[in-house]
């Protein structure tokens, strides 16, 4: 087995990859950009660095221990993020092209910029 399936429960393929630069297009963090840290294929969500921060209060477990406040990135649905071009400051959908060697390369539709 190769690893986790790239499709979700409803068989939609996630076109984003770990390390992609994305912009949030809806919600409280709208227009913020960040890098994808993780992809959760089962729920069709991504975790973006520094975006959708949530706070968790942890109680002390033992006597003499202090409680703490933990900040963490919560997952965002893939429909709420879009690939982002840093050169042109534009969010865009992606398409796949096949080069001369037969390799698949992702490309931004609005700018034509190739994605690594």
Curated annotation (Swiss-Prot):
UniProt-annotated location(s): Plastid, Chloroplast
Q: Which UniProt keywords apply?
A: Chloroplast, Plastid, Ribonucleoprotein, Ribosomal protein, RNA-binding, rRNA-binding
Query: Which protein are we looking at?
Result: Large ribosomal subunit protein uL24c
TM regions (residue ranges): none
Query: In Gene Ontology terms, what is one molecular function of this protein?
Result: rRNA binding
User: Which SUPFAM superfamilies does the UniProt record give?
Assistant: Translation proteins SH3-like domain
Q: What family does the Swiss-Prot or TrEMBL record give for this protein?
A: Belongs to the universal ribosomal protein uL24 family.
Determine the domain of life of the protein's source: Eukaryota
**Subunit note:** Part of the 50S ribosomal subunit.
Task: Supply the InterPro entries for this chain.
Answer: KOW, Rib_uL2_dom2, Ribosomal_uL24, Ribosomal_uL24_KOW, Translation_prot_SH3-like_sf
Q: What does the protein in this record do?
A: One of two assembly initiator proteins, it binds directly to the 5'-end of the 23S rRNA, where it nucleates assembly of the 50S subunit.
Please give an example of a GO cellular component term from this record.
chloroplast
What organism does this protein naturally occur in? Pyropia yezoensis (Susabi-nori)
**Keyword Signal (UniProt):** no
